[in-house]
Structure formats: structure tokens, C-alpha cells
């Protein structure tokens, strides 16, 4: 059984990247034939970063489920699609509402992940702008 190869060397690197506002990709290579190995490896990188997540893109059916389970996300409310076949949801009953895009492993065009990332970035920028407008209106 091959252990996953994580591109980032430590959870500290993930936390540092997220803390400085960078989009961060955690890529797991290798054959994960046992769910416990996958969950343990994923937990080491994702769980300490949960409060820093501004959005989440999870790919692959079992992989996406593993990511959501590891974070303690058990309910999503479907809000729409980034594009056909790429559902956009928000967490329910989690630490806070978190935008989530899920993608079947081999589904979509070559730039599907970039489209998902751009969608979440636009959503985050829109949310910040709306919050700033509300704050400005409350000051008046």
C-alpha cells in the first residue's frame, strides 16, 4: 500500500499559505487503498486549517466525501452550479457557512478546477464588497 505524497511538506505550509491569503492546493498522489490512510493523511493537512478556509473545492466522489468528513461537514445546501455538472453548495451546521464546489474526478473541461477557483474568488470578493457596503450604510 502506497502512502500519499503530499506536495506541501507540512500543515504549517498550508496554514502559512492560507493565512497570507493564497489559494492553496493540497494534492494527494498515490494509490490509497484503505480509507483510514487517506483520512489520516488528509486530516494532518486540512483539519488545522479549517478556520482559515474561505471556500473549498473537493474532487472525486470518495475523495470529496473524505475531505468533507474529515472537516466534520455532514450537510450541504445546493445553491446552483458553477457550470453544468459542477455543483455549488454551502455548508449547513458547520463552524460557519462555507462555499463548497464538488467535482467528479474526470468530469469537465481541462480548466474546470480553474473555473471553480475563479467562481469562489468572485463570490468572496462580492461578499466582501457587500459587507463593506452594509458597514458604510450603518455608519451613516
Question: What function would you assign to each model-found segment?
Answer:
Residues 1-140:
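Active-site catalytic microenvironments in core metabolic enzymes, especially phosphate/sugar-handling
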